[in-house]
UniProtKB/Swiss-Prot annotation:
Homodimer. Belongs to the RNase Z family. Its EC number is 3.1.26.11. Zinc phosphodiesterase, which displays some tRNA 3'-processing endonuclease activity. Probably involved in tRNA maturation, by removing a 3'-trailer from precursor tRNA. Keywords: Endonuclease, Hydrolase, Metal-binding, Nuclease, tRNA processing, Zinc. The active site is at residue 67. This is Ribonuclease Z. It comes from Streptococcus uberis (strain ATCC BAA-854 / 0140J). Zn(2+) 2 binds at residues 67-68, 216, 274. Zn(2+) 1 binds at residues 63, 65, 145, 216. It catalyses: Endonucleolytic cleavage of RNA, removing extra 3' nucleotides from tRNA precursor, generating 3' termini of tRNAs. A 3'-hydroxy group is left at the tRNA terminus and a 5'-phosphoryl group is left at the trailer molecule. Signal peptide: none annotated. Its cofactor is Zn(2+).
Amino acid sequence: MELQFLGTGAGQPAKQRNVSSLVLKLLDEINEVWMFDCGEGTQRQILETSIKPRKIQKIFITHLHGDHIFGLPGFLSSRAFQASEEQTDIEIFGPLGIKSFVQNSLAISGTRLPYKIHFHEFTDKDMGKIMETDKFLVYAEKLAHTIFCMGYRVVQKDLEGTLDAEALKKAGVPFGPLFGKIKNGQDIVLDDGRQILAKDYISEPKKGKVITILGDTRKTPASQRLALNADVLVHESTYGKGDDRIARNHGHSTNMQAAQIAKDANVKRLLLNHVSARFLSRDCRQMEKDAASLFENVKIVKDLEEVTI
């Protein structure tokens, strides 16, 4: 499971940072990639990665500001150009209005897609669990931005314990149907009368990962709820230390506010993105250092950077 950041800048493209987009790679888990936001130029950023557009089967939009959605029509169109590969449908989750934006953009440009788009639109009355599969849950809450904006909490369901095949072989259990019974938690009796207890050969269930990905937001209790005990929190850092007032006026957060949320929510790792273009490399190093005074395990991520979860 990995995060890869396609755009980590704020507002408009800059030389070092494109606008907002990131992907959650779940290739080992479910052979899918999930995208979060799709600012302009996202499809160009993908060309610099190993990501296959057809693997992107779910897109989660945080809000409808242009730097988070203007790349969506282009990405959906270029995804259709993979004629030699199997076409897969795509699901788009986001605020009310995302469906009309996408459909109007495609219609006006005369774009016809060889796959279906399934839209899931939400208002502030629809928050809570918004998606569930056999392996994952996704929750959403309203954040505190200048327009309706959502934050997402992706929860991997606990993983089943693994079967210790080598130990079973040593115990004289013949490979075959008996292995399956033990894996399903069923005790068995061998031909020689020995009882094999399933619990002795299956490891404890492994706790699933929790990844919280927030959109643009002021400091708000909703961020802390979404991030509670998360393995990774992706939080915006449009402004730096001492910029609390201007951040609040513009519906954004500072690096210090993000660090405080991470600390209060007991997250394991904080990744800061949505960085203003006015912050150069040396400024970002200082912002990271300042944030680390509140929450040690913090990093300001760069475009195309990958983080293993």
